[in-house]
């Protein structure tokens, strides 16, 4: 574009360096966008798209936003996945001849937001990088708003994906094109993936990372952060290394299925474990709580250390209540310190910092009065009295937001500033006296002396008072004409204006310099402030644990050395909270080395899934160091939790419900150990009945013979309930239900033994399906059950249990041939049954329903809860009635 103006040439040159960003190009009081940037921004921001050089042959698309309100527009663009490069004027246009120098001072990306309004205060804003070296991965991530920086090494892709999901970054930086399947998995977390082809000469050092892979991953991350932010980030902490195996492992599906931090239906915090447990009082505590939920501990000593502090707060109710009041006055120290270091802190932020650190002595004194494990654990709390005094002496209590307009500092903080302010004040007093004098001299009572930034000070007279008024007679010089007034200046006013404005300008300039000096002084406290923030966040989490334990009647869990899981009257903490507490039915669970598999049967909607979830959630809460919703809890320490709950296609990867089910089952069967917990909810329902039944049985046998992981397995395949005869480690339990006058009543109580009825039609009635459908289903079911009974008399059960001598690996060709012959015989019988069933069902459908008193009695029998003796007695009674 040879005919473009010098300004547009400057724009195009800068834009060529930031092609993946929307360029905010500063022109006066606006940030302007051009070409495709303007089209995109106008659409997303819903602002007017105009044209530059509209009368020329090829006008340039253009839009803009005011610079003073740009943050809200930038926030909207970032939330829509864009990056924004901010290009500022580096010179004062009024004092520059020719083209004003411009350059990009910062690139805002989803992972580098620093503005308070652009972030959820209760969520970290992570940016993450990883590299692949041979078959291993190294990963590093940070939150530049808080200074947190961590790195780890990972052995395989599955663990990498799990770790990325746990961290939940808003942006990912990689050094090469990544595998398409891996990219799809990453898109579960974030769509902002940046590829960096090379690392620039670093102006920083990655300290204390001896592992070369982690060093390179962290260097890649920091190179990108410094490249986009273009400033000192001294608040970034020294990189902390960790190992994923130091925490309980849960993959994306487990966290989703258990609804730990996000609900499945609403995609929100409400209705999750995080929602239940969050009684924190500070943003730092809320963020720490989410981290603890995502990473339960596996170190028994650390778990019990947290539990002992929670117990201390439980025993000191009054002190805990007082502590909550103190914490409520603490602002987000982590992010306040981050803004100090970053350079975008304002005076109101520093007042918040002052109030926050003023509470530390109160908190420390309170903990010391408890004189127990809590006071010892948090003894490193530091009052920071010297910093508090500096803030107390310097800033006024309610300063303006802008740091460039003055009015920030207390009188007495700076002698020079006081002199400027006094000169300005005296000048304003003089102006008030001049206004009174001019009113007297001219006889115009409404005359006033005013000021604006364009014209300075002036005398204003309304048009109604101008009739017969001669300005020259009073030494007035016309300055501006308005529709309803005239504005004048006098030589005396002009002379005083220079003095007043000179003092004001000097005062404003000096206040800005003083504020920058104060900010730099506070930066020297960065490390100490970050340490206090970390302590307060952990303290806040632990008092929150005590608060919910007291409020909802939780107990302190104990950890067994013999790997026993024993829960008495356990409850699902979230379901219990949304229900009336007295309506929730608690249940027991007992798994140990000998009986480590529960096979759970019962009707739909009876509470099987809730029961399994509550066992998993109680285990997570316990390993976080929290009390749990039970009367008594003895638990092992689980290394991993695997879940297969619910039916949902994976639309991202294009996988069916059944494929997702099998993939989740594969992970559990492959990676589970004796120290793992497996939750399988109705495995096999995504395929044909016989395939599903066979797979479900094979999985149960595999767990029983290999990993010995503690397993809760719910099913509607009632044929599986005979497995307890061959697998000593398996125990049948069921969730009880009752029938009363043809209506199904859920008891929600888990009892020993199996049931052979899923009450599907009764559940359908509860869902208000049409009566015609319900009646038709009952007829078909009766016919099918009659045919099935005939079949059962002709052949044995299809359930075949592998003996210990015939392990999964030892399944022979002869076994396969026998199974094939059995399948053929079963298929012949099955075809005959289906023909008989089909004929019977249509005959029954056309007949009228006959009812009688005896039929009603039979219909209302709860066979599942009757003993054999009770059944025989009832049968005899009915037989007598028929005679």
Curated annotation (Swiss-Prot):
PROSITE patterns: DNA_MISMATCH_REPAIR_2. ATP binds at residues 602-609. Keywords: ATP-binding, DNA damage, DNA repair, DNA-binding, Nucleotide-binding. GO terms for cellular component: cytosol. The keyword DNA damage applies. GO terms for molecular function: ATP binding; ATP-dependent DNA damage sensor activity; damaged DNA binding; mismatched DNA binding. Gene3D superfamilies: 1.10.1420.10, DNA repair protein MutS, domain I (3.40.1170.10), MutS, connector domain (3.30.420.110), P-loop containing nucleotide triphosphate hydrolases (3.40.50.300). One of its GO terms (biological process) is mismatch repair. Pfam families: MutS_I (PF01624), MutS_II (PF05188), MutS_III (PF05192), MutS_IV (PF05190), MutS_V (PF00488). InterPro entries: DNA_mismatch_repair_MutS, DNA_mismatch_repair_MutS-lik_N, DNA_mismatch_repair_MutS/MSH, DNA_mismatch_repair_MutS_C, DNA_mismatch_repair_MutS_clamp, DNA_mismatch_repair_MutS_core, DNA_mismatch_repair_MutS_N, DNA_mismatch_repair_MutS_sf. Signal peptide: none annotated. Belongs to the DNA mismatch repair MutS family. This protein is involved in the repair of mismatches in DNA. It is possible that it carries out the mismatch recognition step. This protein has a weak ATPase activity. This is DNA mismatch repair protein MutS. It comes from Staphylococcus haemolyticus (strain JCSC1435).
């Amino acid at each position: 574009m040879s005919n473009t103006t010098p300004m547009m040439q400057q724009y195009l040159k800068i834009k060529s360096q930031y092609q993946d960003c929307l360029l905010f190009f500063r022109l006066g009081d606006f940030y302007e966008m051009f070409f495709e940037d303007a089209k995109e921004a106008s659409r997303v921001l819903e602002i007017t798209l105009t044209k530059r050089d509209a009368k020329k042959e090829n006008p340039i698309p253009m839009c803009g936003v005011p610079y003073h309100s740009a943050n809200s527009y930038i926030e909207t663009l970032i939330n829509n996945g864009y990056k924004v490069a901010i290009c500022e004027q580096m010179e004062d246009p009024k004092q520059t001849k020719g083209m004003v120098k411009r350059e990009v001072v910062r690139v805002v990306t989803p992972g580098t937001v620093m503005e308070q309004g652009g972030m959820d205060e209760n969520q970290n804003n992570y940016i993450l990088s990883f590299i692949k070296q041979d078959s291993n991965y190294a990963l590093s991530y940070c939150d530049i708003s808080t200074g947190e920086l961590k790195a780890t090494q990972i052995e395989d892709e599955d663990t990498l994906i799990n770790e990325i999901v746990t961290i939940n970054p808003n942006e990912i930086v990689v050094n090469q094109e990544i595998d398409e399947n891996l990219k799809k998995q990453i898109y579960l977390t974030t769509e902002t993936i940046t590829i960096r082809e090379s690392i620039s000469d670093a102006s920083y050092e990655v300290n204390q990372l001896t592992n070369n892979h982690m060093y390179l991953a962290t260097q890649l991350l920091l190179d990108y952060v410094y490249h986009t932010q273009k400033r000192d980030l001294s608040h970034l902490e020294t990189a902390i290394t960790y190992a994923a195996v130091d925490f309980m492992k849960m993959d994306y599906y487990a966290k989703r299925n258990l609804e730990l931090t996000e609900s499945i239906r609403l995609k929100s915090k409400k209705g999750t474990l995080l929602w239940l447990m969050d009684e924190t009082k500070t943003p730092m505590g809320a963020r720490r709580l989410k981290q603890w939920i995502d990473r339960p501990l596996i170190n028994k000593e650390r778990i019990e250390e947290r539990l002992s502090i929670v117990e201390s707060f439980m025993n000191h109710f009054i002190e805990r209540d007082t502590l909550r009041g103190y914490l409520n006055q603490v602002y987000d120290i982590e992010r306040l310190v981050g803004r100090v270091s970053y350079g975008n802190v304002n005076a109101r932020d520093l007042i918040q910092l002052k109030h926050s650190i003023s509470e530390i002595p109160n908190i420390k004194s309170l903990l010391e009065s408890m004189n127990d494990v809590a006071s010892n654990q948090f003894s490193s709390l530091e009052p920071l009295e010297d910093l508090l005094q500096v803030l107390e002496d310097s800033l006024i209590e309610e300063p303006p937001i802008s740091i460039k307009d003055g009015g920030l500092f207390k009188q007495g903080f700076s002698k020079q500033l006081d002199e400027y302010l006094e000169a300005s004040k005296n000048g304003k007093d003089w102006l008030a006296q001049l206004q009174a004098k001019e009113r007297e001299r001219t006889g115009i009572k409404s005359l006033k002396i005013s000021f604006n930034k364009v014209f300075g000070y002036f005398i204003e007279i309304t048009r109604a008072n101008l009739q017969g008024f001669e300005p020259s007679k009073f030494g007035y010089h016309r300055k501006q004409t308005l529709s309803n007034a005239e504005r004048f200046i006098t030589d005396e006013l002009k002379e005083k204006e220079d003095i007043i404005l000179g003092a004001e300008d000097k005062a404003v300039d000096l206040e800005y310099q003083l504020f920058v000096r104060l900010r730099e002084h506070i930066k020297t406290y960065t490390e100490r402030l970050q340490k206090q923030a970390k302590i307060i966040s952990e303290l806040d989490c632990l008092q929150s644990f005590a608060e919910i334990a007291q409020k909802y009647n939780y107990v302190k869990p104990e950890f067994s050395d013999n790997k026993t899981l024993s829960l008495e009257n356990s409850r699902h903490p979230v379901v219990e909270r949304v229900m009336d507490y007295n309506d929730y039915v608690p249940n027991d669970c007992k798994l140990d080395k000998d009986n480590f598999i529960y096979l759970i049967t019962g009707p739909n909607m009876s509470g099987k899934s809730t029961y399994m979830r509550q066992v998993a959630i109680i285990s997570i809460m316990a390993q976080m160091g929290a009390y749990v919703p039970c009367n008594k809890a003895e638990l092992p320490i689980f290394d991993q939790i695997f879940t297969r709950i619910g039916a949902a296609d994976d639309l991202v990867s294009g996988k069916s419900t059944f494929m997702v089910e099998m993939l989740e089952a594969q992970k559990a069967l492959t990676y589970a150990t004796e120290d793992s917990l497996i939750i399988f909810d109705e495995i096999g329902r995504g395929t044909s009945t016989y395939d599903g039944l066979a797979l479900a049985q094979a999985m149960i046998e595999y767990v029983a013979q290999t990993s010995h992981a503690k397993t809760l397995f719910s099913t509607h395949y009632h044929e599986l309930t005979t497995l307890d005869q061959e697998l000593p480690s398996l125990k049948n339990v069921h969730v009880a239900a009752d029938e009363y006058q043809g209506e199904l009543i859920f008891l929600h109580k888990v009892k020993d033994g199996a049931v052979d009825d899923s009450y599907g039609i009764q559940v359908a009635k509860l869902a208000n399906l049409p009566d015609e459908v319900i009646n038709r289903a009952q007829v078909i079911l009766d016919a099918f059950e009659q045919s099935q009974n005939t079949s059962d008399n002709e052949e044995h059960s299809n359930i075949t249990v592998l003996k210990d001598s015939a392990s999964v690996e030892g399944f022979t060709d002869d076994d396969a041939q026998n199974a094939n012959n059995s399948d053929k015989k079963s298929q012949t019988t099955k075809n005959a049954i289906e023909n008989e069933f089909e004929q019977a069902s249509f005959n029954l459908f056309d007949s009228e329903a006959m009812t009688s008193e005896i039929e009603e009695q039979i219909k209302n029998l709860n066979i599942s809860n009757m003993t054999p003796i009770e059944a025989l007695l009832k049968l005899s009674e009915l037989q007598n009635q028929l005679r």
